[in-house]
Amino acid sequence: MPHTAPDPSPLNATGAVTVPREGQGAPAYEVRTLGCQMNAHDSERITGLLENAGYVPAVGREPDLVVFNTCAVRENADNKLYGQLGQLAPVKRRNDRLQIAVGGCLAQKDRSTIVEKAPWVDVVFGTHNIGSLPVLLERARHNQQAQVEILESLETFPSALPTKREQAYAGWVSISVGCNNTCTFCIVPQLRGKEKDRRPGDILAEVRALVDSGAVEVTLLGQNVNSYGVEFGDRGAFAKLLRACGEIEGLERIRFTSPHPAAFTDDVIDAMAETPNVMPQLHMPLQSGSDRILKRMRRSYRSTRFLGILDRVRDRIPDAAITTDIIVGFPGETEQDFQDTLDVVAASEFSSAFTFQYSIRPGTPAGEMADQVPAAVVQERFERLTALQDGISARLNRQLVGTRAEVLVSAQSGRKSESTHRLSGRSRDQRLVHFTVPDGAVAPRPGDVVSVPVTGAASYHLLADPADASQYALRRSRGGDAWEAAQAESCAAPSSAGSPQAVGLGMPTLRKS
């Protein structure tokens, strides 16, 4: 297919690759994120790189570039990627300007296999060389040949790359990349490498910069945040980091994800309890309640230790909402093992749980285990577990009816229901709250904070419908100011149902009456 030869030195003033225009204006991009918060934050960096190179978001037009940022944790992530790539094949045939790039953990794992399965893909890049994407795209365009570049170690710490934050009022900050654990079900350490920690000063500088730009909430990210500091010889570094973040003026909400039960220490619990802007919420992955299965998983803790952590957290932070991850059907799991998990879930009283059916991941020790659990058994156990957790979540949420929730309003509330006109946001303990603005009251902007009465509850959300304006309080925040300024800068109308939402902050858009 014909291409205009690129400028032999396609660099902008900052040294970044710029894309040739080919007489049709700036090329448009779309980033599709498949995976966890790490991937979503990486997608913000991909977006920043692309816009720095001259691309613009594909709003109301067909993209010239589609970038997939992939996950390799579960089999359905593979299926989702190749399904979407298949849908793009005919689009590529009729649009010779379209480029397709695949990055992230699945790209790091599958490498050239992606191009073999989907030869219409132009670029495959890994978790360690996100910054190379603009160069690889230009090389693929110039050479008219797919470019596959996977590095075995980190090229540049990702936070050094340009970043376009999806929301002005909230953001992620990476404190480390990679993982030193050896869980038998997980392929992430192979794909993201050994843990590398940023220095506290760099992290705090990024947090301050976010707050200065209007952010009121920051989430600290790492594969195992409470092992932060081991690389530079300070095992208490994470607790110190939480306290230091707590001293940053204007930062209203601090969250972090994810810790590991084996390394979760009381100094972190104390820092959470004693730092007012660290939110009363904790995500603590259980994975299994069976000590036998935990040993096979190489999780380095047992159920008694796990429950002890929850007890200590609730002793210091009585209103803490605790969430978890659970795998059902790990190889060798017996009915008794599963019953042990149900018992721990019942005792833990999680506010919610991310439950997963185990899927074989090639390259992991668990994938080689002979005693795989039949799919029908896994499905039946999964349904029993989710029924138990749904009941616990609903009961805990119903106990909040009659209390008030302080809600940070989300920009991603989804389509307004004609019958309820509800907006959405997150409470201090990270519960999803759908609320109405009473007649005569001022509507909030995304990033503002409202105080509303909880009037209803379901398993995974709260409802807040103030009877009148006297039950509703709005606090216009710096976050709302930042959101409004960003809208004006982009000459965009406030978010609507048709707006692209490539990266979000974990705010579901589903609303039920």
UniProtKB/Swiss-Prot annotation:
Query: Does the entry feature the keyword Iron-sulfur, yes or no?
Result: yes
Cellular component aspect of the GO annotation = cytosol
Record's subcellular location? Cytoplasm
Region annotation (Disordered) ranges: 1-22, 490-513
Q: Which residues form the Radical SAM core domain?
A: 165-395
| One Pfam family per UniProt | Radical_SAM
Please name the PANTHER family in this protein's record. CDK5 REGULATORY SUBUNIT-ASSOCIATED PROTEIN 1, MITOCHONDRIAL TRNA METHYLTHIOTRANSFERASE CDK5RAP1
The protein, known as: tRNA-2-methylthio-N(6)-dimethylallyladenosine synthase
Q: Which organism is it from?
A: Kocuria rhizophila (strain ATCC 9341 / DSM 348 / NBRC 103217 / DC2201)
